[in-house]
């Protein structure tokens, strides 16, 4: 084999190895990639049943229903809503009128089945995805929560 052919052989082999590594990396990221949707995004775009994603917004007032360890509540972006079902312990800061981000998947009945629920850290914090969604919908209100959203003493 001449030097020229050997060099070409190594270059082609190196390119194949690079493409294989890139393909494996992208496949690994695809499995771990979790997208964020607002309730309006879900209405407009839809998501495949069983596909993992995050949904965020505000917990609608009067929507929290507890049945043993299972909790059902409605997440809204003040334009559309999505019903969420979660089994487990909710964060201490979870309450109606506050921002949440839930991670899980849609079931066949159109309910979002959450594997985890994240709540606001304090009265001034809102998850960035939720804030962007509310700004895009024109419903953004900057400042402290309203009296209805504040926790009971």
From Swiss-Prot:
Ranges for region Disordered: 132-153
Cited InterPro entries: CcmE, CcmE-like_sf, NA-bd_OB-fold
Annotated Low complexity bias: 144-153
GO MF annotation: an example: heme binding
TM region(s), chain numbering: 8-28
Membrane topology label: Single-pass type II membrane protein
Cellular localization per UniProt: Cell inner membrane
Alphabetical list of SUPFAM superfamilies matching this protein: Heme chaperone CcmE
GO CC terms of this entry: plasma membrane
Residues annotated to bind heme: 121, 125
Periplasmic side: 29-153
GO biological process: cytochrome complex assembly
Keywords linked to the UniProt accession: Cell inner membrane, Cell membrane, Cytochrome c-type biogenesis, Heme, Iron, Membrane, Metal-binding, Signal-anchor, Transmembrane, Transmembrane helix
Entries under Pfam families matching the protein: CcmE
Intervals, Cytoplasmic compartment: 1-7
UniProt family annotation: Belongs to the CcmE/CycJ family.
Cited function: Heme chaperone required for the biogenesis of c-type cytochromes. Transiently binds heme delivered by CcmC and transfers the heme to apo-cytochromes in a process facilitated by CcmF and CcmH.
Protein name: Cytochrome c-type biogenesis protein CcmE
Name of the coding gene: ccmE
